[in-house]
């Protein structure tokens, strides 16, 4: 307890601390989370000298991506960073409350094992959020993070009320009203207070979509500082153009910690650059205890790494080279920094944003995304919807899908638009627009996740769901919370192809299997088989291979169940020889992070499964052969 009190007073006494996001949120926002361990190893010696208060290196999409795309072990990633950085910076991970890094609510036993292993592997701070801001969903993680000596950083997810259509005179005469605002300053403070009461060591205002305007953060920071006795961190993005101005405003209003990226990974869909924050702090007389010489060395290395990541670079627009320690600012740009400070102090938002945009334009950071700004939805949600519609050759209904977001969101209980609820609402808005286009009633096609959200399995929504709507979507009027007592552990079979070893050999591997069932299964199988083959070097008998090939190329004679959209086969719910009825779910297809139950249009007997679980399939690809 003394250590925790000391931590609080140490943070509260500092002028401004920096949480560097480059190796997690930075690479996830701009480069599809594709940094390899070898690339990370190149910057770690400089990070050891940089003296950031904290470094976000784990969680979010990192554990999934390193297994799925890089064939690397997520636990190794955390342990290798800790081995080099030591105790210079606190290593941070982002965790989704009861869902941890996965998408299902887990039992306390799994949450405890996960927190213990994370902290033993080098984690210092767990940033915990819940997509619904349901405080009950973060309770267990707070408890176990603290039990094993970690720091619990609880995030309040910032979101805004939908833009409802303007009501005409006739609507008003009929007594129609738009819903009252839900996401008020009092709402966010109440969530922060509840988290503090549960033992949060710090609170983050987490704006994942960059939609918080400087004028709003100017209200929230003083409100939090006056009513909470723990440090306040501010996290935002630059996508719609508010990020830099909002961070400057937060610093002026007395925030304890801000989240930044290093220059070549900053701006655009990412967070603001530490180098710009450094200039503002110098002008404001705010102490910033970061070694900017080490930061410049990291940035030089990041330039080369970004070149290597060109194929997955979201903007392909490099900022102009700049080192605040050695490069002189032109007088007119130096003046823009002064104008921004002056405007922030005077609460003149328009002038503040104009100055910040002039600074970003001079350094060639990406321009504000006007579509995201206008639609007021997260950039990731918007790009997911576009990708979904492109795959379905239905870009003509994008506008309709965007229009339907407030309707779908309100019907589902007004969830904040953050992962995973932003994807659930976005995918459902697309489904509804497709229903309308096909002349079907809205909600004819719903994802499993949308059903679970409406049912209550994700937790309490900010406003209650209409029982009649719940009945229509989920088959029940009553809210049914997820019952973790019914949770079933993932199977952990012996791998015959790897000499009979267990798929997951230890607790850390078991946890990977629980959090990422299909991805971890593929990764661990590959690892175990490769290790076994390296030891035994024996080829499989040729005859067996020939038989397997012949079977694979056998022509399809029965009816087939085809993929209605591109996606990945999560699991089959039937096996060869099973009898199926028309309309029965036979396969679960993951598309755009949503699980879709695919039914057969035919009754009969399953002859064979035409693809393996984990396979990526195109639209119209046959998945199952059925003999009628």
How does the language model describe each region?
Residues 59-190, 210:
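Active-site beta->alpha loop and helix N-cap motifs at the rims of alpha/beta catalytic domains
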Residues 240-253:
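Catalytic cores of alpha/beta
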Residues 1-6:
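Short, small-residue-biased leader/transition segments that mark boundaries at the very start
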Residues 48-66, 342, 346-555:
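Terminal or standalone catalytic/regulatory effector modules within metabolic enzymes
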Residues 18-23, 53-57, 89-96, 126-127, ...:
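Hydrophobic faces of well-ordered beta-strands that scaffold small-molecule active sites
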Residues 39-61, 116-125, 198-199:
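Catalytic domains of carbohydrate-active enzymes, especially glycoside hydrolases
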Residues 26, 128, 203, 254, ...:
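Conserved, mostly hydrophobic/aromatic
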